[in-house]
Amino acid sequence: MAGGVTGGGSATWSDRFEQGLHPAIERFNASIGFDITLLQEDLDGSMAHARMLAQCGVISEAEADQLCGGLEQIRAEAAEGRFQPGLDDEDVHFAVERRLIALLGPVGKKLHTGRSRNDQVGTDLRLWLRRRIDELIPQVKTFQRALLRQALSHRRTLIPGYTHLQRAQPVCLAHHLLAYVEMLERDRQRLEDVRKRVNVSPLGAAALAGTPVPIDRRSTAAALGFDGLYANSLDAVSDRDFAVEFSAAISLVMVHLSRLGEEVIFWASEECGFVRLSDRCATGSSLMPQKKNPDVPELVRGKCGRVFGHLQGLLTMIKGLPLAYNKDFQEDKEALFDVVSTGSQCLEAMTILMDEGLSFREDRLEAAVAADFSNATDVADYLVARQVPFREAYQIVGSVVKQCLSEGVLLRDLSLERWQSFHPAIESDLYDALAPRQVVAARTSEGGTGFDRVEEQLSAWSERLDLANG
């Protein structure tokens, strides 16, 4: 390895073989190009393993001290950019072991006692993913806070509510934004739940059947912060459920980011015009000088595909594998690494977009909710309150809307006399019920968009998200 400090040599398992690997197969087989990402976790796991071996009398305390000192030296070399594994290291585990032997001599060869790369990589991957989950959960919360800040700024602002992308009923904009806070809360809870199944130690399962070496699995599990142990050694080295489950959880995060992103794209269009994008979160066209493009939500929408693809790839990878470890598992790492990276980047970008990248155009919103038939349901509710059966009221209002459309007028434009021709129970107070703010205020059921109910939601979320300190 030119320029490195790990040294070279044949593979650790090569004494069994008479010929070396074909160079192309060596390149095809190696994972060092990406699993070096697990270096810190590999060092942590190895130090815990060395200390446990000494506690169990397998090696001496002095040898454990030497091993841990060597591992810390490798950590320092990596921090300084001097630890440079090469292709002949195959993976991060061999790279560390070779460097350790180069540093310590025969003592370095004792580290792998009672351990296989199979349980070692499972341990590394779980430690790495646990750390990433612990970073992602606060990111989700940070984005929730950004949404909540926007909601608090628009507690009395109205926006058209849609079904089938057709205007349905006006809602409070804060209520609309809080719907995404709710989705993200489920995402956060899913990540916390996934963490429980990530945080189980496979270390000590060895290759597949356990080890005759007198080890203490509970000692290494405790030292590494695991909540428990795999009870079955075959399951311990074969399990990648946690990788699938995590990828599914992030896929749902991406779904929710993409749904909001799609709405922002729609809101920012000239056809809609509900939001104005800031220069800090939009780009222009190389040809059309008038353009301001919503790149952030478009990229989030597009990046869903790669996360969903990794989830499908993991499922496909493990679906036909016999017990126990198989080389197919090498394919889990790049998928997980990219799922984490993509999810984190998208959360960060959408947080910036919500905090700094858009502003709602209240004049356009006010005009939108006043210029449609989204108050039609309230006419039906008005009639129901006057003892008209709902289905009859529904039919009456449908006829009124049909007439208005043919005449090019809105419900508010009809005279009282005209209204009463449709049903005698209608009085002048109908016009108050048709006002957009009254339409929203009337939705007083728990969880509804009525202003008082929205204030309850805002208060509850401000407390839950500790917004004053966030």
Curated annotation (Swiss-Prot):
Q: What's the Enzyme Commission number for this chain? A: 4.3.2.1
Gene Ontology MF annotations: argininosuccinate lyase activity
InterPro entries in the cross-refs: Arg_succ_lyase_C, Argininosuccinate_lyase, Fumarase/histidase_N, Fumarate_lyase_CS, Fumarate_lyase_fam, Fumarate_lyase_N, L-Aspartase-like
Q: In which pathway does it act?
A: Amino-acid biosynthesis; L-arginine biosynthesis; L-arginine from L-ornithine and carbamoyl phosphate: step 3/3
User: Has the keyword Lyase been applied to this entry?
Assistant: yes
Which GO BP terms apply?
arginine biosynthetic process via ornithine; L-arginine biosynthetic process
Compartments in which it is found = Cytoplasm
Its chief place of residence is cytoplasm
Tell me what reaction this enzyme catalyses: 2-(N(omega)-L-arginino)succinate = fumarate + L-arginine
What GO cellular component is one of the record's annotations? cytosol
Q: List the disulfide bonds.
A: none
Keyword entries, A-Z: Amino-acid biosynthesis, Arginine biosynthesis, Cytoplasm, Lyase
Class of enzymatic activity (EC top level)? lyase
- Keyword Cytoplasm present in the record's keywords: the answer is yes
Which NCBIfam families does the record cross-reference, listed alphabetically? argH
Protein family per UniProt: Belongs to the lyase 1 family. Argininosuccinate lyase subfamily.
Protein name stated in the entry? Argininosuccinate lyase
The source organism is: Synechococcus sp. (strain WH7803)
Q: What lineage does the source organism belong to?
A: Bacteria, Bacillati, Cyanobacteriota, Cyanophyceae, Synechococcales
